[in-house]
């Protein structure tokens, strides 16, 4: 549907002749009409609208109401106008849609007139000429449905009654409003955020400014909101994080697989799972079939497991995929930089467990694995808060196990308890980062799933050769890669607030060493040092620009480069280098080999990728501004 909305002093029309063989039947009174102080709504119903007329009506009414509220009038003139489109719908459907729009608006209390359909008409109007006086809209069928179509699980999640507690490492379970949060201010912020359940973003978080200034990540106007572009430095960081988490999970014992990004709505197992998983989906049409873009790797991995022959000897069986991408059509007002996206990269491991005992053993191991993974990216337990969620029955039967989880993290944790189980899991934890706006985002998470082995037909053969349904664990040891980047940047924003220098973890620094010759005379020596560093798998570059030395140092500081080397006559003659360390803001004279040894020791065990930009600073494009 195409709509042209004109705020007018008046609109009047007069029927002249038939435009269709069978136009709408009208009375004598309908051959002329006029409204003053009116929003004139010229409308073309298109062929594509026939796929979903109800949603077209709903969406059109919503758009008209929004404009009416802005121009502050109660008078609306619905005017059929075929000239807005070359792909017109059938007259019968078009008239039905226009009548329904008219009736919907009348039912909402507006003063509505509709010009007759299927006639040539003369009309006059007087556009008011203010900034909102002339607007146009294009409405696509199904668009409103995608926004409003909410899985049953999401509705239930909003209705679910939760009981909130704080659990101490000593095993004391305290109602959240009776807990003394002294010394646990971050936990208090997290508890408030979880209990209030408001995800609306009204202020830009600090990490957004950092990601833009550092030329890491940017918004992409050519895509749907919540889909981002990555510049070379940002892509390097993201790629290293992807490799790091993948290496950790494979080292833990998972088998890596790859699965499709879209799945059939009508697949019986998938259809049932959709109604148990609280997420909004992107919808794709292929011919007459509807598909949804995956929001996790569960679907593909479960379908692989369904077709596999699994013995009790294989258990626990771990399968892993790094999804690039997973998709969730989050509400527009909840999208926020790297924290909440519609397309994201999710490390996703699923484990087949023999029984609850084995599942709980794996759960605890994966809890510890998640702590280890976050430690590697510079996040310690002081940087995140723990939420553990379960039913009252699970708590009564497994108190010691839950208390042990609080003991492992070594601080009080937030408990969400339900009287009965609604979700497919019986136990879940998340490590949550609380940012500078007191918003929380889940990073690592593990769940014990008691439903999906039966739903998908996943079985294993026990010691007697009997086919049994296992339990399943869902684990992301880091959470979405984008959220890890968000947490790293938000942590550095907190450090900056305290007047300290921000830093990337050394292994993630896009440029680890910047070499600055004091003049062009020493450029070759600077390149020689850079070559030695690069040969040792250290990312180094040379600032060869014709700028003042202090300016070059300042700009290297702005890029958070951990080591800055200045070379001149003394360094060349003595064979040493003068290094400024960002970590302690001190200057040292050392041998190149000693610097290589230091950096290699600090980055040992982490993945490496070459420098993402040209070796000479003068050869780099500017990606922003």
UniProtKB/Swiss-Prot annotation:
UniProt EC number: 6.1.1.3
Free-text comment on the cofactor: Binds 1 zinc ion per subunit.
Region (Editing domain): 1-147
Substrates-to-products reaction catalysed: tRNA(Thr) + L-threonine + ATP = L-threonyl-tRNA(Thr) + AMP + diphosphate + H(+)
GO molecular function, one term: ATP binding
Ligand binding (Zn(2+)): 298, 350, 474
Major place of residence: cytoplasm
Compartments, as annotated in UniProt: Cytoplasm
Cofactor(s) recorded in Swiss-Prot or TrEMBL: Zn(2+)
Span list, region Catalytic: 206-505
The protein's enzyme class: ligase
GO cellular component, one term: cytoplasm
UniProt KW keywords: Aminoacyl-tRNA synthetase, ATP-binding, Cytoplasm, Ligase, Metal-binding, Nucleotide-binding, Protein biosynthesis, RNA-binding, tRNA-binding, Zinc
InterPro entries: aa-tRNA-synt_IIb (IPR002314), aa-tRNA-synth_II (IPR006195), aa-tRNA-synth_II/BPL/LPL (IPR045864), Anticodon-bd (IPR004154), Anticodon-bd_dom_sf (IPR036621), DTD-like_sf (IPR023509), Thr-tRNA-ligase_IIa (IPR002320), Threonyl-tRNA_syn_edit_dom_arc (IPR015011)
GO BP of this protein: threonyl-tRNA aminoacylation
Pfam family, one: tRNA-synt_2b
NCBIfam families assigned to the protein according to its UniProt record, in alphabetical order: PRK03991.1, thrS
Swiss-Prot/TrEMBL domain comment: The N-terminal domain is an archaea-specific tRNA-editing domain that hydrolyzes incorrectly charged L-seryl-tRNA(Thr). Catalysis of tRNA editing is performed by the charged tRNA itself.
Oligomeric and partner information: Homodimer.
PANTHER family: THREONINE--TRNA LIGASE, CHLOROPLASTIC_MITOCHONDRIAL 2, THREONINE-TRNA LIGASE
Family classification: Belongs to the class-II aminoacyl-tRNA synthetase family.
Role summary: Catalyzes the attachment of threonine to tRNA(Thr) in a two-step reaction: L-threonine is first activated by ATP to form Thr-AMP and then transferred to the acceptor end of tRNA(Thr). Also edits incorrectly charged L-seryl-tRNA(Thr).
Protein name per UniProt: Threonine--tRNA ligase
Gene responsible for this protein: thrS
